[in-house]
Amino acid sequence: MYQTTAALRSAFLEFFRSNGHQVVDSSSLVPGNDPTLLFTNAGMNQFKDVFLGMDKRSYTRATTAQRCVRAGGKHNDLDNVGYTARHHTFFEMLGNFSFGDYFKEDAIRFGWTFLTEVLKLPKERLCVTVYQTDDEAFEIWNKKIGVAAENIIRIGDNKGAPYASDNFWQMGDTGPCGPCTEIFYDHGDHIWGGRPGSPEEDGDRFIEIWNIVFMQYNRQASGEMLPLPKPSVDTGMGIERIAAIMQGVHSNYEIDIFRALIAKAAEIIGVTDLSNKSLRVIADHIRSCAFLVADGVMPSNEGRGYVLRRIIRRAVRHGNKLGATEAFFYKLVPTLIEVMGDAAKGLADTQVIVEKALKAEEEQFARTLERGLGILDSALNELQGDTLDGETVFKLYDTYGFPVDLTADVCRERNIIVDEAGFEVAMAEQRSRAQAAGNFGADYNAALKIDAETAFCGYSELTGNAKVTALYLNGESVSAISAGDDAVVVLDVTPFYAESGGQVGDKGVLVAQGIEFAVSDTQKFGQASGHKGTLTAGSLSVGQVLEAKVDKKLRHRTQLNHSVTHLLHAALRQVLGTHVTQKGSLVDPERLRFDFSHFEAVKPAELKQVEELVNTQIRRNHELKVAEMAIDEAKEKGAMALFGEKYDAQVRVVTMGDFSIELCGGTHVGRTGDIGLFKITSEGGIAAGVRRIEAVTGAAAMAYVAQQQAQLEEAAALLKGDTQSVVAKLKAQLDKMKQLEKDMQQLKDKLAAAASADLAGDAVVVNGVNVLIKKLEGVEAGALRGLQDELKQKLKSAVILLGVAQEGKVNLIAGVSNDLVGKVKAGELVAMVAAQVGGKGGGRPDMAQAGGSQPENLDAALSQVLPWITERLA
């Protein structure tokens, strides 16, 4: 019963129809009334103006099965699609809505009844969350519904971010928002994961199936929370998730709709392994792409069309991975129409257009895909490290039409990180500072082919004689170079470390009688080490012998930072858990950057614990022991492997006491005590499930501490105290400021009351009604509401329109006494004026607000208000 997705959709809509809800068709994926949205991404989007009080429907209860796309802007799930059980670019959101009708108790009861009585889900498999301060919702669940208190979990805000909570819903930076309660389903203890709010909450055992939002506020661009005209309800339940539960499967990709699409894609392409993730990507993407085209979006290089192009091309590439040799994607449209049933009415009507658009884009992409993938493949094969530089990513995008997320997808399969920041500014220095310092393009490594080999002696020596075996100028092999040339010098043996494993290449000089070559970077070119730099004196030929001198100070500082990354890795695994693995690193003389897998921001207390643990190991002054052994033996000893690195049968193992053991080809200190001091300077997220720590060591750490101390002392001086009293004095100042703000508000209220008494005398009488139209000077926009309320009380039967022009903006408020709303509506009045000052607005019949961007037109606009009101009062 209700096991197919179509049956679930029908059951949901029928349940709410029978409970007084109007069944409303899904709106377009292109929002028609909201410039802040790229695509429709929630069921409530089409009702946004209703929630804001700017629109009114003939019903106060509604239910929908809304088509949604999340693949751009704030809500962007594209990177995870196909690789997780529940991420999609397209999904259907089942929802029920109350526009000032029922509120918390009925909303909760409807959800619980549908799940436990209609779908007959076991109550013991369900638990719920509420916003930390929402005692009302907690009591309803506990006292009215009968959910045990231990199965009601309070979820608070993220640290330092008010309202940034899984249980405080907000559509975007602005718009309707409010606390919410969520219902979770327990898939069973055979699946890893914990209850919401627990450290294991990101696991797949407990899955959110229904979110019930209590819409109470309208968030302004300033961050101010304005009460909505009437508290309302917005709920959402992804049909794919509930279908998975009803069909007895864990992954959304195993439900009937996806099974059919995956089977058809496999048939068209000619593959038999239905578990391949590429088939999941294709099955998901055909839904978003087909419905977007049906709703009028076409592939292009900007806006919505660009997002569509990205999704199509990602699907096509996955088809090519599976062996597709001709256009296949558009052939899935008939199957999609069949499995979507009633939800595909609009798609069926536009089937021919949809198929043509998808086929044309697929064929266009095929003409550039092969060449672009070849270039990307070459770049990745030549990559020294675990990060693809932004210049290469930009070249692929700019020259071959590759979206950055498609490049990221290819890199992900090879455990390579994409330098997205570097892509945005089209520069290569995000991966290596030395590449930016030289005059070589970011793809120089890919272009330069060196067959020679270079032996490395730099573990034990920082100087040594070597013979020049090759010279490269502007990417071409030459026999000699002259003073002033920027070139690459290849030696038979070198103490210079070539960039690898996150450690930057060494700098230094190559010298002989009358010859000096300044090395700005050292890179690997196959089995050779290329010394990149400038010949500053003399001339240099192949076959000459030079003395190679590594910059000892820079190498030493780099070694401090490299060795401490091993300690940091081990400390993170101890503090956060063994799920932590290295995802990338950058080690240079100035700092270290360490990327690692973790599902949430590292808490300040955890960071402190990690830092203390690392410094403890530094003080213990462990000897670093290095040993060569078979890779299997190293793994048996528990050695951690570096993310993305390729290893030979024999590997180098670096051990620090009983605290850390890793495979590593880099250079290190002799003892951990050489590091001196370790200080974390920042922690943040760089991708889904990947965090980044930046830190300093040695003298740089001491300088950082000194800077922090200096800032503390400066703050103490400003507060007229010592460093021990800074916190207490700052708290006292903040308390004083709050009191002053409170006193100021009270004064403003008194001034508003006084001003209202003066303003009331300016009212004119029209057909027995007090009419006040006034442009105010020196009044803050935030005071308009209170002033309008005061005036309505004084003037009794009245129509009021107040305007303020300040800082290039106009703020308007209209008020109409209840006895007059049948003749004059505040929303219509304020909208009329707003239209003349470059804005729009609306609200209730008795009170409405608006804004505008043309203060120079305010006087003219106000001059038209009295005739407008007089006409309606006649």
Curated annotation (Swiss-Prot):
- The entry marks the following residues as binding Zn(2+), namely 562, 566, 664, 668
User: One GO CC annotation, please?
Assistant: cytosol
Task: Give the UniProt subcellular location, in the record's own words.
Answer: Cytoplasm
The record ties this protein, via InterPro entries, to: aa-tRNA-synth_II/BPL/LPL (IPR045864), Ala-tRNA-lgiase_IIc (IPR002318), Ala-tRNA-ligase_IIc_anticod-bd (IPR018162), Ala-tRNA-synth_IIc_core (IPR018165), Ala-tRNA-synth_IIc_N (IPR018164), Ala-tRNA_ligase (IPR050058), Ala_tRNA_ligase_euk/bac (IPR023033), DHHA1_dom (IPR003156)
Q: Which reaction does it catalyse?
A: tRNA(Ala) + L-alanine + ATP = L-alanyl-tRNA(Ala) + AMP + diphosphate
Q: Which family does it belong to?
A: Belongs to the class-II aminoacyl-tRNA synthetase family.
> Record's domain comment?
Consists of three domains; the N-terminal catalytic domain, the editing domain and the C-terminal C-Ala domain. The editing domain removes incorrectly charged amino acids, while the C-Ala domain, along with tRNA(Ala), serves as a bridge to cooperatively bring together the editing and aminoacylation centers thus stimulating deacylation of misacylated tRNAs.
Q: What does this protein do?
A: Catalyzes the attachment of alanine to tRNA(Ala) in a two-step reaction: alanine is first activated by ATP to form Ala-AMP and then transferred to the acceptor end of tRNA(Ala). Also edits incorrectly charged Ser-tRNA(Ala) and Gly-tRNA(Ala) via its editing domain.
Question: Under what name is this protein listed?
Answer: Alanine--tRNA ligase
Q: Give the originating organism.
A: Shewanella sp. (strain ANA-3)
What is the primary gene name for this protein? alaS
